[in-house]
Amino acid sequence: MGIVIKDNLFYIHTKDSSLIIEERDGDLLLKHLGKKIEAYHFSNTVFEKDHAFSANPVADNRNYSYDTQRQIFGVHGFGDFRVPSLILQHDNNDLTRFKFKKAKIIKGGIKARGLPNPHSSESAQSLALILEDDLAKLRMTLYYTAYDDNATISTFVKFENLSDKPVILHRALSTMFDLPASHYDVITFQGAYAREKTLRRHQIEQGLFKIGSNRGASGHAQTPSLILTEHDSNEFYGEALALQLIYSGNFQAFVQKNQLNEVRLGIGINDDNFSWDLQANQSFETPVALITYTDKGLTDLTQESHNFIKRHIIPKNFANKERPILINNWEATYFDFNRSQLLGLADEARKLGIELFVLDDGWFGHRFDDNSSLGDWFVNEEKLGGSLDSFIKEIHDRGLQFGLWFEPEMVSVDSKLYRAHPDWVIQADQREHTYSRNQLVLNLANPDVVAYIKTVLDKLLTENTIDYVKWDYNRNITNIGNGRTYLETQMQSHAYILGLYNIVSYLTTKHDKVLFESCSGGGGRNDLGMMCYFPQVWSSDNTDAIARLPIQYGSSYLYPTISMGAHVSAVPNHQMNRHTPLTTRGHVAMMGNLGYELDLAILTKNEKKAVANQIKHYKKIRSVVQFGKLYRLINPEVGINEVAVQYTYDNQVLVTYVRIQSTIEMMETTVKLRGLDADAIYVLIETGQIFSGAELMYAGLTIDMPQGDYLSKQYYFIKK
């Protein structure tokens, strides 16, 4: 059973882990979060004693303090001086003291209203822990859902105003919990535009370690997740805990080590630009957070996260569906194209075995550069040489699927939409606009804007046979000030995200056969919130094969390969001005959902033959990459000059190795494979050589490479 209640103990069990909570005198205390325990008898009791300067909420007990108890929801104002979970203003203060009232076991999953949620299953079970502050007349319900097919717990919080007066939320985390003192590291995934998801590992010291975004989106610079792990853990050893937020807006995540070396973790909506007006009898629900645990190292944590996302996050109709190999015209043409050029690109793509043609920015309004037309989602027939419908038909007649680029959340000042509705943009009254990429952001907190976007895009998707949509978001939000009051303005950032989810939920439900790819200048909104609706993410605008290695490597820790778009582009690369071999560009792009983004027509005969062979090969290994278990064999951040990853699926094994820089007088690299059947025989398809699983895992595979920079090698094995 996923949920068990025994006396004053609440057990939340996954297939391998347990979260155990004690109710004591109305307080909820965390007793264990880790390896599965069926029966708990307080072996790790916190010995209570009088700590100096620790406040005591009970007058006659100097040994009991919220400052030293391990909690699952940090109280505010009664002696817990750590980061609180909640700040809620009522009357003349923001003190809250919630006490436990009752618990309920619920079959299946519980969904947060208006927000993305994991898909539930019949075997899932949920626990509702209901607490109330009788003085302030507030109710707080903590929801936990356990999944028996995974080591993940999903959780969120619901706040209800039971009083007859309004209250204001200033902080509302999705989850928070305290862990015993130990030597911990925190892993985060940071970066910037065109270098997203770079792995960073820090040792936790006393104080506060915090990441977040206040950009209106999850952003390129940080990811709404963190991993807490034992200091000496590695890929295949040690305890690790992942905390992820299913949300696409402003977020915060933190690890805090207090004066007693106890550690608190939390994740949720960022306090910056957030408050929420909770009127009498109204409620507020936080985004859902995920807690994933392993005691088998970071690779196992990765595989648990990948499995959960594929089973419970990615839309079901695409979770187990192979992704098409695409050609995107952006780096081939940018804004400068006509019908003849595009059809020529499609002809070349068809000959090479590509399956999907994507028409990127520049097909609508009078858009010949990035100065105009966002919001005017009607085809420029003069530029496209006819109607959109006729162009799509020509693509389909070539045996290719058709995809189209949109940026629905944005508007250009030079557009019919802006001239008709200048009040629809995010803008503080009497302030000048702040531009980015020459565009403004539509106010998705406005129901009229939401209705307009839904209507326009629904019409386009209904009237045209579009197989794929690339949904872009090319700037962050500034000048927030559309509210009639300051409080209403503080609600705008979260209301924007709720409006976004309203739109994408509607469109992806109605057009459920369309493959949507999320993009924000690459990975500027690469998060689980978007992934609940869009099965694929353009993980970076950087298409350079070498620059992509740490981006894709970092992405792999929590996000499955099938969610990641990766393209072969021209040399010199348009972002890095680097020359890399076509073979290496292909191998790196094959670490994700393979695509091409270059002018195929100008390739030499030999290059076209090489691309055709890449595509033919990828079609053989596509299921291994997109559905297989991933093992990281060499970390580019540690190995400096090389990276190696392995995918295993059914009886197939694929190893991809990339050398970044060559060195003189060095022995060849040997990598030890993982997760094989030690007693089985594996055939290397390229040469016909045979190896035992034990040999490949324990002796290793020596990489046979010539001298030179930016070289790569793939090894494809079949288990006999």
UniProtKB/Swiss-Prot annotation:
Subunit structure, interactors included: Homotetramer.
Top EC category: hydrolase
Family of this protein: Belongs to the glycosyl hydrolase 36 family.
The organism's place on the tree of life at top rank: Bacteria
GO molecular function, a single term: alpha-galactosidase activity
Enzyme Commission code: 3.2.1.22
Name used for this protein in its record: Alpha-galactosidase
The entry's keywords: Glycosidase, Hydrolase, Magnesium, NAD
Cofactor(s) essential for the protein: Mg(2+); NAD(+)
Pfam families: Glyco_hydro_36C (PF16874), Glyco_hydro_36N (PF16875), Melibiase (PF02065)
Stored Gene3D superfamilies: Aldolase class I, alpha-galactosidase from lactobacil brevis, Golgi alpha-mannosidase II
